[in-house]
Structure formats: C-alpha cells, structure tokens
C-alpha cells in the first residue's frame, strides 16, 4: 500500500511540503504534524495572494482535505491547535477572497457545519460564563450586604443614599455635564434601552466598569478632581450596593469630547497597568513613537477613522465585486445608521466614567473576580489597522514581495515578515479571562477547547461572503453540528455539585440529520454584549437572508427562521416598516422574530 507521507530522497527531503513559491497537493496528505504545519503556514500566504492557487484548491481536493482537518476537532496539544488554526485560516482566505465559483466550492465542501459548531460552542461558553459570573456576584453582594447592614433604628431613621436631598452645588453638577466632555447623540441601538435592559443586561449590580485601552481612555485631571471632590462619591461603601450609573449614561466618544494626552502612572486604571494581562502587549500610541503625546483629531478625521469600509469597497483578489448584484448587504447602505453617531469599527465609542475616582477600591477588587463587562476588541485599534485575518498569520496585502523572496532565500517564513510593529495586540475575550483565572482543571479544559474570538469573527465574515448567493441557502438552513468539535463534555465538567453525565458515543457525522439552521445562531451575535465586529458581520449575514432569489423570479423568503415560507409572486409579503428590507408572511411571524430582529433592524428614510 502506498505511503501517504511522500518524500524526495534526491533532495534530502523527508516529506513534500508547500513553500511560498511552490504548491504541491501531496503536502496536504502528510500525517506528520510538523511538516503539515509548515505547509499550511505557507499555504495561508498563497491563498491570500494568489487567485490561481485558490482556483486550483477547488479542483484538486485541497478544500476537502482542509475541511477534514477541521472536522478532526481541536486538541489540547499546542501543535494540533496550531495545525487546526492554520487550516481554518486557509479556508477563510479561500472563501473571502475567492470568486463566486470558489466560494460555492467552499460551501459544497461541507464547511458550513464547521462554522455552525464554532458559533454554537461560543454561544454556550458565553452563556455559561455569564451565568456563573452573575451567581458569584450575587453571592458576593449578598455576603457584603449582610456584613454592612446597620441596626434597624439607623435604617428607619436615616434616608437611603438615593433619597438624600442634594445641595445646590450637587444639583447644579447633576444638571450640567462637565464642560470638557460633550455627550454625542445616542447610538441607534439605545433606542430601546429600557426594553432591552430586562433581557440583555450585561453589567450586573456588583460589577465595576473598567475601560481600556490607555490611549483612548485618558481622563483630564480637572475631571478627576471634580468627581473625587463631589459629595456623591464621598461614601465609598454605597458604591457596591447599587448598580453603577454608567449603565444609565449615554455612550460617548472620547475623541469627540476632549483632547487626549498621555496617561501618568498614578492615573492608570487596572486595565492599563503593566502586567495586568499576562502575556499581552498594549498597542502603542504610534508605531514609531510609542511615548509621543496623542494629538487631538478633528471631527472629520475621527469620523473617517470610525467608518468601516463596506463590502462594496473590499474587492477580492480575483477582481470580483464582493457585494454581488444589488440589494446591498452591508450596514453602510443605511443612511440613518451612518448619520447617527454609531461607529461600526474604530475608536472606542463608550466610556464608563462612573466610579473612576476611587481607584484604590478598583485595584482592590481586581483579584476577586473578573468583570464580564464586555470591552470591544475592535475599539482598541484604529479602523485602518483592522483586518479580519489576524496579523499574526500571513496577510498578503501587507507583505512586500521583495522581502518575501529574501526571507524565502534565508529560510524564513513570510509570517515573520508580516509580524511588525503595526500588528495590533489581540485582546482576549472577557469570557476567556474569566475561565483563565479559575484554577480548576475543568475551567482550563474549556479555555483550551472554546473557540477564540478570531475564529468566531472569521466564521461570521466567511458567512457574510458566501450567504449572499441564494442558490446556496439550503446549505445554511439544513446543516448539522460536527461531533468532534462540540464541547458539551467540557462545559458539563464546570457544573459544581452535579454528578457527571455519561454522554453517548458520538455518532458518525454522515448519520446525523441536517436539522440545524445557522441563521438563528448568527442572529444571536447581533446582540449588544458581543463585540462591534461580531455584530457588524452578523448583521451582514442576516441582511443577506433578506435577498430576493433572482433565479426564482425575484421572490423573497419569510425572514422568520421557523417559517421559511417563500413568496408565490413578487411583493406578496409585507416589509418591515422600520428597515424596509425584511419581509414576513404574517404579523405572527413578525412578532415572533422581533425578539432578535430589533438588534439588526435599522431605520431607513
């Protein structure tokens, strides 16, 4: 029987591998991990820069082989995890940068079940982390409240903190905002803040809001003294017994209100302190002058930096427009969403200014439990540096061909050429930080097997590019989960005080029914507590669901996933009055779908 590990003895090669100048399909069949990682590392570069390589992979079985590597599951071994990540990067490059035929082949190679499993795992981990964090915070708040409760006479005779009369100075300070801070208009997602807070309240009553990074959360010294000298903040013990006021304040952009300056060491928040995040390096203010003062930008420059380039502007390497033929699929086409002060990607548009004065208390509470108030990773880097394919892997748009050739002659990987000072530091998810601080074996097991934020982000982006083809919609609405990629066992180990459940052996994947609709999974990422990038790409996918099928006479499908009814003729279904894009066959479907549709329903004039 033929050995799958091909070798070339005459050139002293133990295995065939892929280089930056040579593609050999036999290298993907290698069963040894190290040479396969080497080949996948170079293939990631080739799939980014060469349209011909992407086309070849669709006809020689290369995509199927990459999907098989992904379906083998994530292992706790570092080399196996590296192999899985590189294979996933290659498939995303092929699907995002390829032509319509190439993207069709990616979907036909059964990539959708892999994406569905990744999204489902991430949702389960987020729900588990939030549930455990809420229960822990409630226990801590109840224990703290029991220790700090005064006598009954004092309670009956003294008004509460919220009932105390305000002095004239305090009333004035409450009525008027500080002169150095300007509050911009509320974003579009805060229209239903009161209605949403009952279901999707991210900040629990006992958590302390924290802001990052240092270059975009610098507070003026006058603001600091004004808040610390205010009588409302003199009672530090009341802060832990009430919900932070930051949840009731409208979000604001730091760059629009006041000029930024370097942060002194004695003014740093916990998230700014060196060594607070182990193994992470913060992004400098400037790639060339890390300690240079940050200059205030004009409103026009800030607006440009906050705007995300639409899919219409992101051309694939093969020269095809990524937006298809009309019926736009991006959020940029919504004039109301662009005119409202809601940046999709870019500078930090939210600053929790409450409880900043008492920094010692904040530092003292860091070690107890991690705050799961989500800080958006996309807000910690400039819009021009945002790239969905993270810079630690190869990005052909940033690589100089001369340098790549020189590195190849020296035996270096192109990854080293792309990894420079402009590469932003990847900020871990607050949920991964939550599990990382837990010393139990089960928590570390979940941490090693849970999808990374980059994996979820690339999955959503890949779906955004392939879901706009209506002839492929059946692949998204009738899919399944990959058994070897599921993390139900690891999540079950986190349950304390429960007997372990004996899970049945995983069935073969080909025996599983295709009863999973991926659109409800994607719709859950449009909720606010996910990062802005996840919300953006999830909204693009959901808007692609509203496209009309030109091959069937321009009819549309009911947007409620449990219905899925198609129009019998054009304009049979009524559109949503707010977004004028989503169609429903009945009022009942519209009411049932509004629970999540409100998060990606944007007003159009």
UniProtKB/Swiss-Prot annotation:
<dbReference type="GO" id="GO:0008270">
    <property type="term" value="F:zinc ion binding"/>
</dbReference>
<dbReference type="GO" id="GO:1990304">
    <property type="term" value="C:MUB1-RAD6-UBR2 ubiquitin ligase complex"/>
</dbReference>
<feature type="region of interest" description="Disordered">
    <location>
        <begin position="134"/>
        <end position="187"/>
    </location>
</feature>
<feature type="compositionally biased region" description="Polar residues">
    <location>
        <begin position="279"/>
        <end position="315"/>
    </location>
</feature>
<feature type="binding site">
    <location>
        <position position="579"/>
    </location>
    <ligand>
        <name>Zn(2+)</name>
    </ligand>
</feature>
<feature type="compositionally biased region" description="Acidic residues">
    <location>
        <begin position="320"/>
        <end position="336"/>
    </location>
</feature>
<dbReference type="GO" id="GO:0005737">
    <property type="term" value="C:cytoplasm"/>
</dbReference>
<dbReference type="InterPro" id="IPR016024">
    <property type="entry name" value="ARM-type_fold"/>
</dbReference>
<keyword id="KW-0749">Sporulation</keyword>
<feature type="region of interest" description="Disordered">
    <location>
        <begin position="203"/>
        <end position="352"/>
    </location>
</feature>
<dbReference type="InterPro" id="IPR051664">
    <property type="entry name" value="MYND-type_zinc_finger"/>
</dbReference>
<feature type="binding site">
    <location>
        <position position="576"/>
    </location>
    <ligand>
        <name>Zn(2+)</name>
    </ligand>
</feature>
<comment type="similarity">
    <text>Belongs to the MUB1/samB family.</text>
</comment>
<dbReference type="InterPro" id="IPR002893">
    <property type="entry name" value="Znf_MYND"/>
</dbReference>
<feature type="zinc finger region" description="MYND-type; degenerate">
    <location>
        <begin position="560"/>
        <end position="601"/>
    </location>
</feature>
<dbReference type="GO" id="GO:1900735">
    <property type="term" value="P:positive regulation of flocculation"/>
</dbReference>
<dbReference type="Pfam" id="PF01753">
    <property type="entry name" value="zf-MYND"/>
</dbReference>
<keyword id="KW-0963">Cytoplasm</keyword>
<dbReference type="GO" id="GO:0030435">
    <property type="term" value="P:sporulation resulting in formation of a cellular spore"/>
</dbReference>
<keyword id="KW-0862">Zinc</keyword>
<feature type="binding site">
    <location>
        <position position="601"/>
    </location>
    <ligand>
        <name>Zn(2+)</name>
    </ligand>
</feature>
<protein>
    <recommendedName>
        <fullName>MYND-type zinc finger protein samB</fullName>
    </recommendedName>
</protein>
<dbReference type="GO" id="GO:0007163">
    <property type="term" value="P:establishment or maintenance of cell polarity"/>
</dbReference>
<feature type="binding site">
    <location>
        <position position="597"/>
    </location>
    <ligand>
        <name>Zn(2+)</name>
    </ligand>
</feature>
<keyword id="KW-0863">Zinc-finger</keyword>
<dbReference type="GO" id="GO:0006511">
    <property type="term" value="P:ubiquitin-dependent protein catabolic process"/>
</dbReference>
<keyword id="KW-0479">Metal-binding</keyword>
<comment type="function">
    <text>Involved in determination of the onset of polarized growth and morphogenesis. Plays a role in the regulation of branching in hyphae and spore formation.</text>
</comment>
